[in-house]
Design a protein with these regions (language model features):
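Sec-dependent N-terminal signal peptides of Gram-positive bacterial secreted proteins and lipoproteins
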Residues: 3-27
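Membrane-insertive, amphipathic helical modules of secreted toxins and fusogens
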Residues: 2-5, 10, 71-73, 79
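Short beta-strands and strand-loop turn motifs
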Residues: 51, 81-85, 113-117, 152-153, ...
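Extracellular glycoside hydrolase catalytic/binding regions
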Residues: 33-34, 62, 132-136, 140-150, ...
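N-terminal carbohydrate-binding accessory modules
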Residues: 26-79, 308-315, 322-325
Length: 326
């Protein structure tokens, strides 16, 4: 072996350190929070994370936070999806209130999925952009919480069943969030009020590619169209998963306006296929939709539907596992 000069040795050592540290850097960054890899969501400890949880209409019932969140936690839920408002449709949830929500959810050992509800069903980009601007305005609550807070950019933005226009919107929205320094895992709801999964199948990969962090999960809301029967549930899940994309069912019920929903199939296939799900919603649905209430009040007893979601063979109590940070 040829003798190495001192300068050469230093150069070699420096090169080796660069290789070692450089290869470790992406892994360390990913481990600071939730991340997507190979079409699956992982928590900051490197464990696959399957959401088993409940939606809570916080923005409409702001005073119930300290009652509702502990009650939801008692079901065994590992995640709670929180309705927030940017002030365009409902009463705004400001920075300090969001910080408090995160603290309460965290104290109850659940992951907080935060969503802006004001853009629901709207097709104009301004509504989506308003949601993005809201997240940027409260980013102090999000940055540093990547291991316990996930951002669902806008609830059911793009009501029309048009995948191309839906994708165009998110391909602008996601880079804007990332450029602002928000690195949390993002969730994007399907077009068609969340019930048009073909939008994800056709355009989800291009939306995912627009994320510099490659840390986006897609969400189907399964009601009377996307979740009407077992065959539909199964194919809708498989069609997205076959594209190599991470998927959750961000909302579902047991029934909806125009027909039945197979909540049993959603939970069963969610377990079999590793798809997270979040049932809609804890309580407080309007008259005529109160069959969607899981409980009779913020600390109320479970309804029949709630009992199914919590206690069924494939329900929360039998399938939920807490995130590794807890």
């Amino acid at each position: 072996m040829a003798k190495l000069q001192k300068g050469t040795i230093v150069t070699v050592i420096a090169a080796l350190m660069f290789v070692i540290l450089g290869s470790a850097a992406p892994k360390a960054a990913a481990a600071s929070g939730f991340y997507v890899n190979g079409g699956k969501l992982y928590d900051s400890t490197g464990k696959p994370f399957y959401m088993r949880g409940i939606n809570h209409g916080h923005s409409w019932f702001k005073n119930d936070l300290n009652t509702a969140i502990p009650a939801i936690a008692k079901t065994g839920a590992n995640t709670v999806r929180i309705v927030l408002s940017n002030g365009t449709q409902y009463t705004k949830d400001d920075l300090n209130s969001v910080k408090n929500i995160i603290n309460v959810v965290n104290a109850n050992k659940m992951i907080a999925v935060l969503e802006v509800h004001d853009a629901t069903g709207k097709d104009d980009y301004n509504s989506l952009d308003a949601a993005v601007n809201y997240w940027i305005s409260i980013k102090e609550a999000l940055i540093g919480k990547e291991d316990r807070v996930i951002v669902n950019i806008a609830n059911e933005w793009y009501g029309t069943w048009n995948g191309s226009a839906w994708a165009d919107g998110y391909k602008k929205a996601i880079p804007k969030l990332r450029d602002a320094g928000i690195k949390n895992t993002l969730i994007v709801d399907a077009a068609g009020w969340g019930q048009y999964p073909q939008s994800i199948v056709d355009y989800g990969q291009s939306v995912f590619a627009a994320d510099s962090q490659k840390n986006t999960v897609f969400s189907i809301h399964m009601y009377e169209y996307a979740g009407k029967d077992a065959a539909t549930v199964k194919s809708n899940m498989e069609n997205v998963l076959n594209k190599g994309l991470a998927l959750i069912i961000g909302e579902f019920g047991g029934y909806h306006t125009n027909g039945d929903v197979d909540e049993y199939a959603i939970m069963k296939y969610g377990q079999e296929k590793g798809v997270g799900w979040l049932a809609w919603s804890w309580y407080g649905n309007s008259s005529g939709l109160n069959y969607l209430d899981l409980a009779t009040g913020p600390n109320g007893s479970l309804t029949s539907y709630g009992n199914t979601v919590v206690n069924d063979t494939y329900g929360i109590k039998n399938t939920s596992q807490k995130a590794g940070i807890f």
